[in-house]
């Protein structure tokens, strides 16, 4: 059984985060039963990002950090975006090599530090799909 836990933020944010992550698992990774996802709602104080996804020890354990100052709509969209990255790691579409700036996307190596963020293929996919899934969250009345 998948484990999804939200920490930080307020109770409403934690409830929304857990429901959206559970929904996204069903949409993107319906056959996965051993995912361990922790959502940390915190002050990111980062001008360039409102969320991050990190694979932990293996491609079943993840930490998602989301800026707790986001409004509900942006919170949902950001979690959908980061869950697309979870899918990419879990399905081994993406693998990054910590500290070297290199990442592999579907077998091809990219230097993430030398490629424009919005031109990275995993980001292109996440941005392309985030609104589709955020709209589904609202349409399906997940929250």
Where would I find each of the regions flagged by the language model?
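Post-HEXXH active-site segment of zinc metalloproteases
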Residues: 73, 89-123
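Short pre-active-site segment immediately N-terminal to the catalytic Zn-binding motif
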Residues: 62-79
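Auxiliary, metal-adjacent structural segments of Zn-dependent hydrolase domains
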Residues: 1-57, 72
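Active-site recognition of the HExxH zinc-binding catalytic motif
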Residues: 77-89, 126
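Short alpha-helical hairpin
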Residues: 54-59, 103-105
